[in-house]
């Protein structure tokens, strides 16, 4: 029943060493070798403060509200070989102690916010998930019938959007991260006088402005339905397996297809993990990907199979309202004296809204 909770900044790194010295009751990991919680048989619970905060130690120190501390730099030589018998100097011990104090101060602020260490969520995404869940399932009014009705409507909607295991696996094959690939013409070189554009809260903005699949996937019989017509229908979204033959990039700096997302490949010339040219490949994509691929590549032949369609609609109103509330708090509380905690919380939660939607199960 009793637990001793210990926070470790980047638990997945430290765990590979410390796992040998404890007997474990249970370990919760988000990926292979990425535990975020580990409990020993005698009740010691290790949690990951890096996953909770989303910040490096240096950035974490900068974002503390009621504590003033900075991460020390340059006082620890990582090139030296050390073992369990190595004595650390006062300067080195000070460096190590400072890192621990940053995490300690952060957790103290979290306890103040949540009232109890056991109430602190495991991840930053967990905070926003609970916030959005409450918006979707409960009414702001004190009337019980309002909350019951809202809860039932949202539950019914989620049932309408549920997936089979095969459909979920296929959607995972479609999923890609952001396109941040460097041009092979300039990779490794230092460029002067460059320009850039930053879209403020770009991911949440797109979640508000665009339509998303709001139905179960429906298998398409391409003998009866025109793929081209479906592709041009803004009320329909598609996912499908796509075989491409004779693939050639139209230019040298926009290689969209990721080599790791392709299978049954032949004659691939890769540009740092991206397909520059291929005799043949198969991949699983959406209609959005397909339009981008057509814009980036010259392709001799395209064969579409295993096609599913979704009916597109804007995200449920409670989710949109939750995003808008977080954005409002982020913008109106910035720089307001006495609202530092609320500002940083809203900023962190807003940045985690997209991550909440693409968390693997």
Task: Cite the ranges covered by each PLM segment.
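Conserved acidic
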Residues: 2-10, 15-361
């Amino acid at each position: 029943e009793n637990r001793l909770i210990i926070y470790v900044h980047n638990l997945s790194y430290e765990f590979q060493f410390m796992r040998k010295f404890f007997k474990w009751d249970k370990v919760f990991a988000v990926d292979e070798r990425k535990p975020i919680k580990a409990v020993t048989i005698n009740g010691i619970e290790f949690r990951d403060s890096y996953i909770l905060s989303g910040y490096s130690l240096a950035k974490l120190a900068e974002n503390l509200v009621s504590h003033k501390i900075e991460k020390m730099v340059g006082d620890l030589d990582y090139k030296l070989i050390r073992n369990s018998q190595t004595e650390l100097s006062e300067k080195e011990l000070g460096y190590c102690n400072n890192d621990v104090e940053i995490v300690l101060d952060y957790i103290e602020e979290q306890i103040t916010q949540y009232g109890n260490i056991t109430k602190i969520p495991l991840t930053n995404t967990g905070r926003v998930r609970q916030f959005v869940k409450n918006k979707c399932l409960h009414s702001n009014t004190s009337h019980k019938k309002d909350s019951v009705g809202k809860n039932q409507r949202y539950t019914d909607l989620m049932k309408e959007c549920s997936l089979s295991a095969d459909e979920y696996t296929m959607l995972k094959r479609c999923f890609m991260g952001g396109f941040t690939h460097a041009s092979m013409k300039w990779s490794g070189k230092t460029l002067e006088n460059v320009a850039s554009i930053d879209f403020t809260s770009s991911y949440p903005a797109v979640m508000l402005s665009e339509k998303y699949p709001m139905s179960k996937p429906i298998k398409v019989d391409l003998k009866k339905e025109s793929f081209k017509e479906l592709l041009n229908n803004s009320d329909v979204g598609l996912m499908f397996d796509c075989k491409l033959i004779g693939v050639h990039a139209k230019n040298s700096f926009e290689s969209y297809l990721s080599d790791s997302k392709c299978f049954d490949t032949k004659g691939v010339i890769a540009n740092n993990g991206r397909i520059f040219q291929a005799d043949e490949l198969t991949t699983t994509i959406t209609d959005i990907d397909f339009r981008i691929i057509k814009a980036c590549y010259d392709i001799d032949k395209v064969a579409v199979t295993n096609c599913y369609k979704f009916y597109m609609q804007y995200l449920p109103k409670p989710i949109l309202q939750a995003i808008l509330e977080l954005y409002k708090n982020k913008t109106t509380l910035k720089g307001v004296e006495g609202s530092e905690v609320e500002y940083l919380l809203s900023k962190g939660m807003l940045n985690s809204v997209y991550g909440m939607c693409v968390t693997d199960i």
